[in-house]
Amino acid sequence: MNLIPTVIEQTNRGERAYDIYSRLLKDRIIMLGSAIDDNVANSIVSQLLFLESQDPEKDIHIYINSPGGSITAGMAIYDTMQFIKPQVSTICIGMAASMGAFLLAAGEKGKRYALPNSEAMIHQPLGGAQGQATEIEIAAKRILFLREKLNQILADRTGQPLEVLQRDTDRDNFMTAEKALEYGLIDKIFTNR
């Protein structure tokens, strides 16, 4: 069951009901709380573009609790975060895994955070192929290319040498908030506002 809370606000014109995500958007907060697919990416990208149009100078905050998902969908979010004028802060709540961790690291340097009991997980891209040998070869080359591209971006975002990223993403690599801070995925652990 997908229950979305409603928030009632009092205004000088009476009461106004919002779903919680719309109300958070008014405060420039975007929630990424699911696996990342094309629909989720389109929603996040649309919200980023909308908030930029509202005020290109004011920060946007993305709260992340995601197991990851599609690389291409995640890259659409990443590219938009880099493209828009407002700085984007990222906050890990719960778990930022795979593409979720990649997007956590993609926040504005100095504005990437985690709550104390949250976790991050990085690994190499997952994929599979079937069909003729040529099709499998094409898919294998593509996933190797994506692995190198993602590792290079993560190396740039974390300050880790590329060789370290290649080693550390070879298998699932879980990190506490403290380890994510030490690694360079985040810049600070939030304990309160």
Swiss-Prot record:
InterPro entries: ClpP, ClpP/crotonase-like_dom_sf, ClpP/TepA, ClpP_Ser_AS. The active site is at residues 98, 123. It catalyses: Hydrolysis of proteins to small peptides in the presence of ATP and magnesium. alpha-casein is the usual test substrate. In the absence of ATP, only oligopeptides shorter than five residues are hydrolyzed (such as succinyl-Leu-Tyr-|-NHMec, and Leu-Tyr-Leu-|-Tyr-Trp, in which cleavage of the -Tyr-|-Leu- and -Tyr-|-Trp bonds also occurs). It is found in: Cytoplasm. Gene3D superfamilies: 2-enoyl-CoA Hydratase, Chain A, domain 1. The keyword Hydrolase applies. One of its GO terms (molecular function) is ATP-dependent peptidase activity. Keywords: Cytoplasm, Hydrolase, Protease, Serine protease. Its EC number is 3.4.21.92. Pfam families: CLP_protease. It is an enzyme of class 3 (hydrolase). PROSITE patterns: CLP_PROTEASE_SER. Cleaves peptides in various proteins in a process that requires ATP hydrolysis. Has a chymotrypsin-like activity. Plays a major role in the degradation of misfolded proteins. Fourteen ClpP subunits assemble into 2 heptameric rings which stack back to back to give a disk-like structure with a central cavity, resembling the structure of eukaryotic proteasomes. This is ATP-dependent Clp protease proteolytic subunit 2. It comes from Bacillus anthracis. The lineage of its organism: Bacteria, Bacillati, Bacillota, Bacilli, Bacillales.
